């Protein structure tokens, strides 16, 4: 059965409270169905993906970013990238967003969540961009499933109001950790970020299991994730292997 036909079945069987606008948005993104890929340092397409991310940050924020996360994930169709994000395991090195925090991420997050959290179970995401309407919604859904299969319990990131809107639309709750204060940057200057900080981004964290529970409760979202089950499994294994490697990378937002 083709992805488009599968999507039609998912729409017809979705619960009655499903937002029709969300259904139409996802239907457009799935016809034709996009593909998801991981790009590691030194990979054949890595430079192109970095250029795509940098160009989008420059276009939207007037920013000049030049450092990127260890694992870059892309979403695209027919060779055209429509969204991308980066992932870094906290166990590998200090996180970029820890510059904003008052202490190690596992301690700050543990206090906010009211539970003991192991650093090895935390992933940071960043370098998030999209060039097609709605792409970020689907990317977040698939990324959540990838993180779960890769063994991460928590995800942390710096969220602009637009990213917060995506999370709210999907029904994904987060813990607010602090404001992203550019005055605390040591790895890059605020000037390099253009207008990025004018939107007052927030450092937030989400529990992966809770996010997956929300996605699985919605018939449409669950059906969409099932379409990409094979890709999710493959990308989770890439992320798991890369997270266990020794060494470190330059910090990148």
Regions found by a protein language model. Name each.
Residues 221-242, 253:
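Active-site/ligand-binding-proximal alpha/beta "capping" segment
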Residues 94, 134, 213-215:
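Intrinsically disordered, low-complexity acidic/polar segments
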Residues 1-44, 225-226:
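Conserved N-terminal entry element of GNAT/NAT acetyltransferase domains
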Residues 32-120, 126, 203, 207-211, ...:
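A conserved beta-strand-loop-helix scaffold within acyl/acetyltransferase catalytic domains
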């Amino acid at each position: 059965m083709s992805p488009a036909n599968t999507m039609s079945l998912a729409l017809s069987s979705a619960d009655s409270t499903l937002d029709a606008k969300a259904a139409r948005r996802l239907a457009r993104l799935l016809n034709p169905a996009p593909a998801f890929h991981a790009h590691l340092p030194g990979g054949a397409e890595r430079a192109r993906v970095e250029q795509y991310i940098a160009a989008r940050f420059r276009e939207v924020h007037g920013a000049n970013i030049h450092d990127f996360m260890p694992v870059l994930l892309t979403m695209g169709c027919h060779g055209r990238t429509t969204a991308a994000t980066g992932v870094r395991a906290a166990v590998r090195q200090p996180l970029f967003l820890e510059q904003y925090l008052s202490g190690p991420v596992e301690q700050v997050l543990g206090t906010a969540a009211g539970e003991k959290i192991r650093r090895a179970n935390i992933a940071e995401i960043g370098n998030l961009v999209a060039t097609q309407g709605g792409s970020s919604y689907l990317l977040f859904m698939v990324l959540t499933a990838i993180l779960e299969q890769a063994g991460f319990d928590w995800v942390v990131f710096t969220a602009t109001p637009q990213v917060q809107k995506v999370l709210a639309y999907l029904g994904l709750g987060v813990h607010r950790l602090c404001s992203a204060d550019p005055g605390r940057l040591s790895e890059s200057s605020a000037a390099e970020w253009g207008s990025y900080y004018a939107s007052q981004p927030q450092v937030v964290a989400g529990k992966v299991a809770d996010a997956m529970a929300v996605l699985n409760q919605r018939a449409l979202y669950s059906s969409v994730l099932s379409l990409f089950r094979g890709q999710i499994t493959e990308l989770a294994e890439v992320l798991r292997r890369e997270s266990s490697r020794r060494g470190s990378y330059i910090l990148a937002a």
